[in-house]
C-alpha cells in the first residue's frame, strides 16, 4: 500500500470526519483519479515530437499514455479532425497515490520561483487543476535526453462536494497552497 494511502486512511479520514461532522466514513472525500494531460500542438509538423512527449509522459505517469486527437478541424492552427495533438494518462488507486507522493515531496519543490499553489484553482465541484510549465521538475525525466521543455496539466479529481472539502483534503496531504 502506498505511503499516502496509509496516511489517508489513518490520519486524514478521522481529521476530516471531526472537522466536517461526517457520520459515516464513506462520506469523507477521497481521491478518485489524477489526470495528466500534455497538449503538443507542434506535433502537426513533426510526428517525432509527439513520440517524445509520449515517452516523457510514460516516464512521469508510470503507464502508457493515450494519444489524444483533434475533435474538429481548425485552419488557423493547421489541424484537421482526427490528427494527434497530445497525450494523457489517467492514474487511479496505487499509481495515483505514488504519483501524488512524488509530486508533493519531489516535483513541486523543484519548480523555479515557486511561491505556493493557487488556492483558487478549484472548479466548484471539488476538483483541483494545476499547470506545470516544465516536465523536467520530475526526477524521472533526464534533462540531457529531452528535445524540448513542455508543460502539462494535472487534474486531481475527488469525491468532495464543495471546494472547501477538497481543499481540506489536499491540505491534509500537505499540498503547499499559497496563503
UniProtKB/Swiss-Prot annotation:
TM spans (from-to): none
Alphabetical list of SUPFAM superfamilies matching this protein: RL5-like
A GO MF label: structural constituent of ribosome
GO BP: any one term: translation
GO CC annotation, single: ribosome
InterPro entries: Ribosomal_uL5, Ribosomal_uL5_bac-type, Ribosomal_uL5_C, Ribosomal_uL5_dom_sf, Ribosomal_uL5_N
Database matches in Pfam families: Ribosomal_L5, Ribosomal_L5_C
UniProt keyword annotations, A-Z: Ribonucleoprotein, Ribosomal protein, RNA-binding, rRNA-binding, tRNA-binding
Known function: This is one of the proteins that bind and probably mediate the attachment of the 5S RNA into the large ribosomal subunit, where it forms part of the central protuberance. In the 70S ribosome it contacts protein S13 of the 30S subunit (bridge B1b), connecting the 2 subunits; this bridge is implicated in subunit movement. Contacts the P site tRNA; the 5S rRNA and some of its associated proteins might help stabilize positioning of ribosome-bound tRNAs.
PANTHER family, per database record: 60S RIBOSOMAL PROTEIN L11-RELATED
Subunit: Part of the 50S ribosomal subunit; part of the 5S rRNA/L5/L18/L25 subcomplex. Contacts the 5S rRNA and the P site tRNA. Forms a bridge to the 30S subunit in the 70S ribosome.
Similarity remark: Belongs to the universal ribosomal protein uL5 family.
HAMAP family reported for this sequence: Ribosomal_uL5_B
The protein, known as: Large ribosomal subunit protein uL5
Species for this entry: Methylococcus capsulatus (strain ATCC 33009 / NCIMB 11132 / Bath)
